């Protein structure tokens, strides 16, 4: 995340951005890299067990315990954000009743326009080459449906950039610039600066 923020600081005034961290968990991984550089920070986390830890790790942030996906899909958040970081799980997830309710960032990112005004920077994780992929048939099925491809175990950066540009454009936002940053062996940060058409 350090490289991502350094890249962004050369292009935008980070200190003027109202940021949102989605799937906050403890807030002790990459969130601390940018938390004190932005104008404001709101963190969304579904599990209340993380609330006090989040408050400790991110004392200046506004912590909200809620279902992030339900909140954006149903347009329940009145605030708009300029920097949105989606640190989603890399599989399907949900409730005990519906464990495969959501998948990666898919359900969230399709509704990103609900929390953006005129422009925003979106940072999200992409698993280009999932490992043990065949052991998770529901995850595989959801990826195939979202990306519109039969094989999603190896997605090229070229395909992914084109796919997300088209997805954002369909939602009324053009891509001003984008960049990929390696996070881990199979995981990259995708950074998109979006502007309303």
Model-identified regions with their sequence ranges:
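Conserved class I S-adenosyl-L-methionine
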Residues: 15-26, 123-148
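Conserved SAM-binding loop of SAM-dependent methyltransferases across substrates and taxa
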Residues: 26-38
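Conserved SAM/SAH-binding beta-strand->alpha-helix loop
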Residues: 47-49
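Conserved SAM-binding loop
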Residues: 54-55
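A short acidic, Gly/Pro-enriched loop at the edge of an enzyme's catalytic core
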Residues: 73-88
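A short glycine-rich, Lys/Arg-flanked "PGG" loop and its adjoining helix->strand segment in the class I
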Residues: 100-121
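Short alpha-helix
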Residues: 153-171
């Amino acid at each position: 995340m350090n490289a991502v923020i350094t890249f962004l600081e050369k292009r935008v005034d980070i200190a003027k951005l109202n940021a949102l961290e989605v799937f906050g968990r403890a807030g002790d991984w990459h969130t601390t890299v940018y938390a004190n550089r932005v104008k404001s920070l709101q963190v969304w986390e579904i599990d209340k067990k993380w609330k006090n830890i989040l408050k400790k790790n991110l004392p200046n942030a506004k912590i909200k315990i809620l279902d992030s996906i339900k909140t954006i899909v149903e347009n329940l958040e009145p605030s708009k954000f300029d920097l949105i970081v989606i640190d989603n799980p890399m599989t399907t997830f949900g409730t005990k009743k519906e464990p495969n309710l959501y998948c990666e960032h898919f359900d969230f990112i399709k509704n990103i326009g609900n929390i953006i005004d005129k422009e925003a920077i979106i940072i999200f994780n992409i698993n280009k080459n999932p490992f043990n992929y065949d052991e998770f048939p529901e995850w595989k099925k959801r990826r195939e449906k979202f990306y519109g491809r039969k094989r999603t175990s190896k997605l090229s950066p070229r395909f992914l950039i084109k796919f997300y540009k088209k997805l954002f454009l369909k939602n009324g936002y053009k891509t001003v610039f984008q960049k990929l940053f390696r996070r881990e062996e199979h995981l990259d940060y995708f950074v998109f600066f979006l502007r309303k058409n």
